[in-house]
Amino acid sequence: MKGLLEHEPLQKYTTLKVGGPARYLCAVSDISQVQQARDFARQQNVPVVVLGHGSNVFFSEAGFDGLVILNEMKQRAYDTSSNGVTRATFGSGEDFDEIVAETVSRGLWGLENLSHIPGTVGATPVQNVGAYGVEVSDLIDSVSAVDLETGKEKVFTTRECQFAYRDSYFKTDEGRNWF
């Protein structure tokens, strides 16, 4: 697998700068690379953890005996319909605070109360981040994901995401394997 690192210190990838080595580490920037990483982990029979910017994440100094997938899925797309409604699509590896700032600079309102929340776009629906009376679930139409167990791709509706206060389907035992 291209770009695979072995025994990579995880402290380089967390905001708290702690963590021993990952047995394997790779970065992914598209769905085909996610599938390749998934296949590699299955061949090696090792667990997988997905890492965004490493905020609010602790790794043991003993490290992680598995594959760490760095989420570098970048996409920023805006589509304005004839009735003036803009639909935005963002890659899960995008910096969430940068996205908030960009939408505000474009005059697209809704996310501004969520400014300065650390992490990536992909982490926001998992935790259903919120502040000052706004939750990200108020603004999400759908979430596209890949099941790291089966390789199945799915687009989740907001109902399927089962959003609740700082919670979602993606935090459940059944939903944890979705990237």
Language-model regions, residue ranges each:
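Anion-binding (especially nucleotide phosphate/pyrophosphate-binding) glycine-rich loop
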Residues: 1-139, 143, 147-149
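Long, positively charged amphipathic alpha-helical accessory segments at protein N-termini or as interdomain linkers
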Residues: 154-179
